[in-house]
Amino acid sequence: MTEQSSRTVQGRVVSNKMDKTITVAVERKVKSPIYGKFIKRTTKLHAHDETNQCNTGDVVTVRECRPMSKSKNWMLVDIVTKA
């Protein structure tokens, strides 16, 4: 049995209004099939923040984990920069 490394992404906290949960916006660039121009696309993820230490505007690293609720299957690894 080999252990797979969890997927980690970096994003910006856009909401921390829930208890022990943050919303993280992750930006990625996608190439337009028609024009060939790169377009920014954002994905919003719900992540588990056990100690409620994140604030809106923080840049954080989150990793994938087991489902903790219907929409929350990421957890906070560390805060890269504080807002």
Curated annotation (Swiss-Prot):
Domain of life: Bacteria
Record flagged with keyword tRNA processing: no
Gene3D superfamilies: Nucleic acid-binding proteins
GO molecular function annotation: rRNA binding; structural constituent of ribosome
Cellular component GO terms, alphabetical: cytosolic small ribosomal subunit
Pfam family, one: Ribosomal_S17
Classification via InterPro entries: NA-bd_OB-fold, Ribosomal_uS17, Ribosomal_uS17_bact/chlr
Statement: the UniProt record of this protein carries the keyword Ribonucleoprotein: yes
Alphabetic keyword roster: Ribonucleoprotein, Ribosomal protein, RNA-binding, rRNA-binding
GO BP terms: translation
PANTHER family with a match to the protein in the record: 40S RIBOSOMAL PROTEIN S11 FAMILY MEMBER (PTHR10744), SMALL RIBOSOMAL SUBUNIT PROTEIN US17M (PTHR10744:SF1)
Family: Belongs to the universal ribosomal protein uS17 family.
Subunit description: Part of the 30S ribosomal subunit.
Protein function: One of the primary rRNA binding proteins, it binds specifically to the 5'-end of 16S ribosomal RNA.
Protein name from the UniProt record: Small ribosomal subunit protein uS17
Source organism (scientific name): Pseudoalteromonas atlantica (strain T6c / ATCC BAA-1087)
Name of the gene this protein is made from: rpsQ
